[in-house]
């Protein structure tokens, strides 16, 4: 491991939720307004994940007042407080850009069935 990789590894967050594309997540974002700081929740569907390592980012899409809003978050950014998984989605694509064209019930994502393993 060279020096740059070592420095990047030190700055990466260790407790990142293992979410995937298609999952509905709630992202807690730090917002600084003047000298005040607050946390804002942003909930939506993960439509893509890009890159890897410290440069990794993900795009979350939600519908706000009938208008689709997408926001890109760097995964290891200090402005991200937490990423909480609300529901798991079952999709067959790595990028869900086709959701931009769909409206209403057509834009729904199947929920992944969770079956606990019996011992």
From Swiss-Prot:
InterPro entries documented for this protein: Ribosomal_bL19 (IPR001857), Ribosomal_bL19_CS (IPR018257), Ribosomal_bL19_sf (IPR038657), Translation_prot_SH3-like_sf (IPR008991)
A Gene Ontology molecular function term of the record: structural constituent of ribosome
Pfam families recorded: Ribosomal_L19
GO biological process: translation
Alphabetical keyword list: Ribonucleoprotein, Ribosomal protein
GO cellular component terms listed in the entry, alphabetical order: cytosolic large ribosomal subunit
PROSITE patterns: RIBOSOMAL_L19
Gene3D superfamilies: 2.30.30.790
UniProt similarity note: Belongs to the bacterial ribosomal protein bL19 family.
Known role: This protein is located at the 30S-50S ribosomal subunit interface and may play a role in the structure and function of the aminoacyl-tRNA binding site.
HAMAP family, sorted: Ribosomal_bL19
Protein name: Large ribosomal subunit protein bL19
Organism listed in the record: Pelobacter propionicus (strain DSM 2379 / NBRC 103807 / OttBd1)
């Amino acid at each position: 491991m060279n020096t740059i990789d070592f420095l990047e590894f030190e700055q990466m967050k260790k407790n990142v939720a293992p979410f995937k594309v298609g999952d509905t997540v709630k992202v807690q974002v730090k917002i600084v307004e003047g000298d005040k700081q607050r946390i804002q929740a942003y909930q939506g569907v993960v439509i893509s994940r890009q890159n890897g390592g410290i440069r990794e980012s993900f795009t979350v899409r939600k519908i706000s007042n009938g208008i689709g809003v997408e926001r890109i978050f760097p995964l290891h950014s200090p402005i991200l407080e937490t990423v909480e998984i609300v529901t798991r989605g079952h999709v067959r694509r790595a990028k869900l850009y086709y959701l931009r064209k769909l409206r209403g019930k057509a834009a729904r994502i199947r929920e992944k069935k969770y079956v606990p393993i019996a011992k």
